[in-house]
From Swiss-Prot:
Forms a cylinder of 14 subunits composed of two heptameric rings stacked back-to-back. Interacts with the co-chaperonin GroES. This is Chaperonin GroEL. GO terms for cellular component: cytoplasm. GO terms for molecular function: ATP binding; ATP-dependent protein folding chaperone; isomerase activity; unfolded protein binding. ATP binds at residues 30-33, 51, 87-91, 415, 479-481, 495. It catalyses: ATP + H2O + a folded polypeptide = ADP + phosphate + an unfolded polypeptide. Belongs to the chaperonin (HSP60) family. Keywords: ATP-binding, Chaperone, Cytoplasm, Isomerase, Nucleotide-binding. It comes from the Bacteria. NCBIfam families: GroEL (TIGR02348), PRK00013.1 (NF000592), PRK12849.1 (NF009487), PRK12850.1 (NF009488), PRK12851.1 (NF009489). The keyword Cytoplasm applies.
Length: 544
């Protein structure tokens, strides 16, 4: 076990703060509409240019191990805020630095760090309640567009794309961001339920130009097993053929004699049919078959519940307005399932999301909610170069998360104004002792830091702007992009309440832990002896 280097008290804290300041100073230049870019070197390929705070934070590792500990703790602030709210990473870093730098003065003056932390926590609770109380719901197209534009660093086209996507697939729909192939941004929307399984045989395709099978008002048969014997399907096929409607079979697999007979009947026009493998594997396949059943009003034919395929009737089949099956995907549009049953199923899956601890499981469950509730939208990013593409994708991802947060908890005045206004909630607030009251005042001063940084990045004087904003009321603030004072909501400068709240909570949490740190321990690097020179070979000197 290697020897340890241990530092105590002020010498430990001063090293930690030095690391915090290096990371925070690199991150905070990106804040606001006039925030600057940060260029990150890559070991291969072109440098990465970004205005995304968490991307900058993740790249920083310091040589001094004590300073690096401070930097990594603040990096944790931006990562946590990013995970929960999807944006506000730079704001969180600026707040953490401000709380720490204000607090360390009091610790150095001999105040009790634990009481200071308790005071900060009391103040944070009051400010968070104020933010929640002043938040306005973001349920209209314009508000969503404005939040998206601001989070994408004032890029209005991105805001419009996200608002259009949310309008098309609903607030529960899945919206993904991909790299496009052209110069322009584009939006692709798949309405209805889509899953990644195509037709089992290309002979099921009835549109030869697109190689797809299009079924209008079809019946849907769901089977939780492999089908290889055509005798099992005869009853169902005869019943469907009499109606003259097409049939989609979704099963674990269709093979052998059953597949050959279906293909022949389809090609001869006796019955229009298409067979598709069920999506997913194992328990997830069973769950997705049940989702499709509820969406289309079908019953899953499963031997586990004592049902046999030979006895299936038209009552067990589901229906939909239209189904399109390609080589790789199946899209079910406007399933005839009961709306209440679908809503109950969505609630049930949401409850599973709350209980799940795996990020992968949560993502898959969220996809199932989207497929039942709305649809899937894909925003395709266009750019001239790969470097620009990556930078833009970072911004669009941020904007997408921010708009989701806005829909969830509403919006507040942007540009750091909501935090400055929340200072009023600290008036008359005192702690159990003088040191706790000092902790409350630490947050009172630190809470102005985001607005100061936005103004500073815009090249204006922070103190002048802070005083002017404090003199106003409500949503009155400063538009750093234009240099104009006015109502922030009317000017379209909004922040999701969830982002502002998360940034403050995480910043105060980590800054409080740092203030109460009294010792730091790290490994002492071992001096490894240099490799000896290689011995000389016959007729040669020693190689160096």
């Amino acid at each position: 076990m290697s020897a340890k280097d241990v530092k105590f008290g002020d010498s430990a804290r001063s090293k930690m703060i030095a690391g915090v300041n290096v990371l925070a100073d690199a991150v905070k230049v990106t804040l606001g509409p006039k925030g600057r870019n940060v260029v990150i070197d890559r070991s291969f390929g072109a440098p990465h240019i970004t205005k995304d705070g968490v991307t900058v934070a993740k790249e920083i590792t310091l040589k001094d191990k004590f300073e690096n500990m401070g930097a990594q703790l603040v990096r944790e602030v931006s990562s946590k805020t990013n995970d929960i709210a999807g944006d506000g990473t730079t704001t969180a870093t600026v707040l953490a630095q401000a709380i720490l730098n204000e607090g360390i003065k009091s610790v150095t003056a001999g105040m009790n760090p634990m009481d200071l932390k308790r005071g900060i926590d009391i103040a944070v609770r009051a400010v968070v309640e104020n933010i929640r109380a002043t938040a306005k719901p973001a349920d209209d197209f314009k508000a969503i567009e404005q939040v998206g534009s601001i989070s994408a660093n004032s890029d209005e086209t991105v805001g419009k794309l996200i608002a259009q996507a949310m309008e098309k697939v609903g607030k529960e729909g899945v919206i993904t961001v991909e790299e496009g192939s052209g110069f322009e941004d584009a939006l692709d929307v798949v309405e209805g339920m889509q899953f990644d399984r195509g037709y089992i045989s290309p002979y099921f395709a009835n549109k030869q130009d697109t190689l797809t099978a299009e079924l209008e008002n079809p019946f849907i048969l769901l089977v939780d097993k492999k089908i290889s014997n055509i005798r099992e399907l005869i009853t169902t096929l005869e019943a469907v053929a009499k109606t003259g409607k097409p049939l989609l079979i979704i099963a674990e697999d269709v093979e052998g004699e059953a597949l050959a007979t279906l293909v022949v009947n389809n090609m001869r026009g006796i019955i229009k049919v298409c067979a598709v493998k069920a999506p997913g594997f194992g328990d997830r396949r069973k769950a997705m078959l049940q989702d499709i059943a509820i969406l289309t009003g079908a019953t899953v034919i499963s031997e586990e519940v004592g049902m046999s395929l030979e006895q299936a009737s038209l009552q067990d089949l589901g229906t939909a307005h239209k189904i399109t099956v390609s080589k790789e995907n199946t899209v079910i549009v406007d399933g005839a399932g009961d709306a209440n049953a679908i809503a109950e199923r969505v609630q049930q899956i949401r409850a599973q999301i709350e209980e799940s601890t795996s990020e992968y499981d949560k993502e898959k469950l969220q996809e199932r909610v989207a497929k039942l509730a709305g649809g899937v939208a894909v925003i395709k990013i266009g750019a001239a170069t790969e470097v620009e593409m990556k930078e833009k994708k970072d911004r669009v991802d941020d904007a997408l998360h921010a708009t989701r947060a806005a829909v969830e908890e509403g919006v507040v005045a942007g540009g750091g104004v909501a935090l400055v206004r929340a200072v009023n909630s600290l008036d008359g607030l005192t702690g159990a002792n003088d040191d706790q009251t000092v902790g409350i005042n630490i947050l009172r001063r630190a809470i102005e830091a985001p607005l100061r940084q936005i103004v500073s990045n815009a090249g204006d004087e922070p103190s002048v702007v802070i005083n002017a904003v404090k003199a106003g009321e409500g949503n009155y603030g400063y538009n750093a992009a234009t240099g104009v004072y006015g109502d922030m909501l009317e000017m379209g400068i909004l922040d999701p309440a969830k982002v502002t709240r998360s940034a403050l909570e995480h910043a105060a949490s980590v800054a409080g832990l740092m203030l109460t740190t009294e010792a730091m321990i790290t490994d002492i690097p071992e001096d490894k002896p240099a490799m000896p020179d290689m011995g000389g070979m016959g007729g040669m000197g020693g190689m160096m």
